[in-house]
From Swiss-Prot:
Predominant localisation class: membrane
GO molecular function, one term: ADP binding
Keywords: ATP synthesis, ATP-binding, Cell membrane, CF(1), Hydrogen ion transport, Ion transport, Membrane, Nucleotide-binding, Translocase, Transport
Family according to the record: Belongs to the ATPase alpha/beta chains family.
Name the record gives this protein: ATP synthase subunit alpha
Purpose: Produces ATP from ADP in the presence of a proton gradient across the membrane. The alpha chain is a regulatory subunit.
Annotated site, Required for activity, chain positions: S362
Membrane-topology annotation of the record: Peripheral membrane protein
Binding site for ATP: G169, D170, R171, Q172, T173, G174, K175, T176
Catalytic reaction equation(s): ATP + H2O + 4 H(+)(in) = ADP + phosphate + 5 H(+)(out)
EC annotation from Swiss-Prot or TrEMBL: 7.1.2.2
Protein species of origin: Desulfitobacterium hafniense (strain Y51)
Subunit architecture: F-type ATPases have 2 components, CF(1) - the catalytic core - and CF(0) - the membrane proton channel. CF(1) has five subunits: alpha(3), beta(3), gamma(1), delta(1), epsilon(1). CF(0) has three main subunits: a(1), b(2) and c(9-12). The alpha and beta chains form an alternating ring which encloses part of the gamma chain. CF(1) is attached to CF(0) by a central stalk formed by the gamma and epsilon chains, while a peripheral stalk is formed by the delta and b chains.
Length: 502
């Protein structure tokens, strides 16, 4: 093969023209100390607060403390694989998680990586875990109900789409059960549910996932898990990751329900990180910005205005108290951020009243605007009767000679408390709740023995679902009670009662 000299020179010229002399400039630092999920890095003068940093071996960290001569950063992964002297690169980005439809039905860790053994998640959408909450002008007042399927909540402390309602109580009072029941009740209601498990045992999270799968709820749910065995940084970012996944749907006009189970453990993880980063401790050794930790998370839940697509994100944060002390630091913080709270009590739980909701001190600051009119019509009387019952029950312990009216109110109150009991994983549709509570508030249960109330309720609902299905359908479509519907309900109750009492 003969090459002419002019050809050789033209090839060399082309190669010279193609040569790219650009140099990639990377800001690099050095690890000077590492341990307990924290690394101190020297040499990254231009790093920003919250910036994602890259360690060797594909491990990432997040800059938290920007000090004069070094950076304190939290390590999002196995910190045991990082050594002193390792190089650290800036990325110029903040922590992002994968989002979108591909996440539904999956169990992921705090970084959005799958941990359910079902293969990788195919999505090209990512969102930063920290995001500004929608402003006042971009919100609409909460007006659509989000049904939990639990009579005591839907009637007395109703939750609306876009609301933040705290679930608070001691350990083993059924807080997670209320949240899981609410997720199960969203089936067929076009609501995407996100369950964020923070600091739970891996076996507990596996149990929740199995329950959701058994009830067909994983078809519209995402589970974000940061278990107790994971480093504190993962527990700290997990709620923000779950929130970012929810925001993707909310800003696309969809409705989202997100459960943070529980924020007490997130606060403890943040306290651990803050103390390791040598930040000054405050009350109960929490850092000064622990209020901001929760407020910036919960403020991202909203009901958006029609201009932004009318989507919503409803948040149900869970807080665990110690011996019923709701005046501790974290419980008071979260109570002041949220739009109401559902108190669960150990005494009620142990007495067999489940869900163990104290309807006296549980409140919803959204109130009746998050209820259909039919529920509002029966719930108003229910709330009043229960308040009178609690007051009279306290006095009745001291005296036996009670007048007839007092006796009647106590009788009705006992039956109302009984009718509010509900089995786990058996959420009830709103029209069935209305007809059951109607029977209680109108005094139809007064002459039925308390121990027979639950079996009467079962008979009554069986009749309603079979022979009176059209009546339930009317309540569902009209969403309000009128004289005609009231008469039909009363007729049905009387018929069932005659058969029940013989």
């Amino acid at each position: 093969m003969n090459l002419r000299p002019e050809e050789i020179s033209s090839i060399i010229k082309q190669q010279i023209e193609r040569y790219d002399s650009a140099v990639e400039v990377v800001d690099v630092g050095t690890v000077i100390q590492v341990g307990d999920g924290i690394a101190r890095v020297h040499g990254l003068e231009k790093a920003m607060s919250g910036e994602l940093l890259e360690f060797p071996g594909g491990i990432y960290g997040m800059a938290m403390n920007l000090e004069e001569d070094n950076i304190g950063c939290i390590i999002l992964g196995k910190f045991t694989e990082i050594r002193e002297g390792d190089q650290v690169k800036r990325t110029g980005r903040i922590v992002e998680v994968p989002v979108g439809e591909a996440m539904i039905g999956r169990v992921v860790n705090a970084l959005g990586q799958p941990i359910d053994g079902k293969g990788e998640i195919k999505t090209d959408k990512f969102r930063p875990i920290e995001n500004t909450a929608p402003g006042v002008v971009y919100r609409k007042s909460v007006h659509e109900p989000l049904q939990t399927g639990l009579k005591s909540i839907d009637a007395i402390v109703p939750i609306g789409r876009g609301q933040r309602e705290l679930i608070i109580g001691d350990r083993q009072t059924g807080k997670t059960a209320v949240a899981v029941d609410t997720i199960i009740n969203q089936k067929g209601k076009d609501v995407i549910c996100i369950y964020v498990a923070v600091g739970q045992k891996a076996s507990t999270v596996a149990g929740v996932v199995k329950t959701l799968a058994d009830h067909g709820a994983m078809d519209y749910s995402i589970v974000v898990s940061a278990t107790a065995s994971e480093p504190a940084p993962m527990l700290y970012i997990a709620p923000y990751s779950g929130c970012a996944m929810g925001e993707e749907f909310m800003y696309n006009g969809k409705h989202v329900l997100i459960i943070y189970d529980d924020l007490t453990k997130q606060a403890a993880a943040y306290r651990e990180l803050s103390l390791l980063l040598k930040r000054p401790p405050g009350r109960e050794a929490y850092p000064g910005d622990v209020f901001y930790l929760h407020s910036r998370l919960l403020e991202r839940a909203a009901k958006l205005s029609p201009d932004l697509g009318s989507g919503s994100m409803t948040a149900l944060p869970i807080i665990e108290t110690q011996a019923g002390d709701v005046s501790a630091y974290i419980p008071t913080n979260v109570i002041s951020i949220t739009d109401g709270q559902i108190f669960l009590e150990t005494d009620l739980f142990n007495a067999g009243f489940r869900p163990a909701i104290n309807v006296g001190i549980s409140v919803s600051r959204v109130g009746g605007s998050a209820q259909i009119k039919a529920m509002k019509q029966v719930a108003g009387q229910l709330r009043l009767d229960l308040a009178q019952y609690r007051e009279l029950a306290a006095f009745a312990q001291f005296g036996s000679d009670l007048d007839k009216i007092t006796q009647m109110r106590l009788t009705r109150g006992e039956r109302m408390m009984e009718i509010l009991k509900q089995k786990q994983y058996e959420p009830m549709v709103v029209e069935e709740q209305v007809v059951v509570l109607y029977a209680a508030v109108k005094g139809f249960l007064d002459d039925i023995p308390v121990d027979k109330i639950k079996s009467f309720e079962e008979d009554y609902l069986r009749t309603m679902r079979t022979t009176k299905a059209d009546l339930l359908a009317k309540i569902r479509t009209e969403k309000a009670l009128n004289d005609e519907l009231n008469a039909e309900i009363e007729k049905a109750i009387t018929e069932v009662k005659e058969g029940f009492l013989g």
